[in-house]
Swiss-Prot record:
Expressed in liver. FAD binds at residues 47-79. Belongs to the GMC oxidoreductase family. Keywords: Acetylation, FAD, Flavoprotein, Membrane, Mitochondrion, Mitochondrion inner membrane, Oxidoreductase, Transit peptide. This is Choline dehydrogenase, mitochondrial. Residues 1-34 form a transit peptide. The gene is Chdh. Transmembrane segments: none annotated.
Amino acid sequence: MWQVLRSWSKRCLSPRGALAWAAQGQPRPPCSCAVASAASGGKDEYTFIVVGAGSAGCVLANRLTEDPNHRVLLLEAGPKDLLMGSKRLQWKIHMPAALVANLCDDKYNWYYHTEAQPGLDGRVLYWPRGRVWGGSSSLNAMVYIRGHAEDYNRWHRQGAEGWDYAHCLPYFRKAQKHELGANMYRGGDGPLHVSRGKTNHPLHQAFLQAARQAGYPFTEDMNGFQQEGFGWMDMTIHQGKRWSTASAYLRPALSRPNLRAEVQTLVSRVLFEGTRAVGVEYIKDGQSHKAYVSREVILSGGAINSPQLLMLSGVGNADDLKKLGIPVVCHLPGVGQNLQDHLEIYIQHACTQPITLHSAQKPLRKVCIGLEWLWRFTGDGATAHLETGGFIRSRPGVPHPDIQFHFLPSQVIDHGRKPTQQEAYQVHVGTMRATSVGWLKLRSTNPQDHPMINPNYLSTETDVEDFRQCVKLTREIFAQEAFAPFRGKELQPGSHVQSDKEIDAFVRAKADSAYHPSCTCKMGQPSDPTAVVDQQTRVIGVENLRVIDASIMPSVVSGNLNAPTIMIAEKAADVIKGCPALGDENVPVYKPQTLDTQR
């Protein structure tokens, strides 16, 4: 279904349903806080400058402007998530099923690529990242997964004191408004609408039944007591529309006179006086401008842009900066290091019944799906179709799940940039705590040049063995009786791939990013030479500068990254405002009865 509206005209008209919803937004009154520019010679100050209106930046813009004494400037390199020149929502972003349209389009997307990967047969991988209001929450598959409680306890052990599960859970709950209501794990009053998968599609039902037949439990809530098992996914979809952080946090704050939100604005460097951050320099409409702060500059550009901007500003490995002629403000060798991502592989089967999303690519069917969504926000356009999934342990002795599954009643080829070839279904499966760690470095001093990105995929034997398990365990699930009415031939990797050597070769040839880069501005103790920010999210070695986004994770979590990134921003906002930390939430968390078996 990801291919449904790739060929639709950008001049599509919006009927009453879409217009009525879009009209709920209110225009922002003019802000008196004029941005200082090189041309004017002015020096207007803001309390905070937030760089990046993405998953974290939108949260911060909202929470910081709750205090009317805070004047906040929010700078986004990309455009608004609205139709050009109007207040109407851009359907390409807000229609859940149209997500591939943005993965294929650099208008809202940084369109990064990695360096050639030796562990993946020398392939260069495509890394889409959001460049629009909402950031990657406006491009992603809308899957809301927090990870496992032990991910956050591990952060605490790695030096991010106060970021254990008991101290993070309250901020997951603060952000969330779950359609099923609040409990000890879920939030019920937050701005982020979260819904639960509810499709009756026979292939989703077969997937859940097959997992049970293979001996895995059903879990009622992957974000609650028990992550381990298979069940219905939570999604950031509300009333048939994508619910990004732009919808949840930014739009409600735009009417505040103490918030100025600029788009099409590329920040080129942080301005320093000595080691104190005093503002930023940015490019807009081809002109250089400067804006200044009385308190702090906050980088929320994500795991690629935030370390890139730090290095462009003179904060990073001094030897690397000197080679490019960048004056060193602070030698901080951890900047851009510790890069972690989730890798995944698609296991695909032909379907013997015409019930997959293949038919949705037919021109007339596309029109019908699009019109139903535009009119009512219902139908196949109102979901990304990744409504079931699961988490399991790869082998005995693993304490909590390290493999994740997303099921899709369709076939994905080249990130959805190529149409499906036939009736088919697939599982996205991958490991969640790889031991391979990468890096990113500046390619040049030009802020418009993408940095060198080296995830170092499959560089350890452990990671190769874990992916071998991913393939074998997925095949076992697909072989269960529940899929018998639908099971055609295995399309990928194909029945001819059987030996460990053949499976390894398949993984190296076909594995791809799950789009979860993180950890490049690691949070830790100031005494840790690899740390970039402290437990308060302050950049070590300088003043008045923070990083708040997925880059500060000490290690990648066991699941998708959007929910944890929003949590990080909520928690950091309280730190900045000096609010008392929300109370400990010591809730029960499932543990396997034995680690002697894999399930």
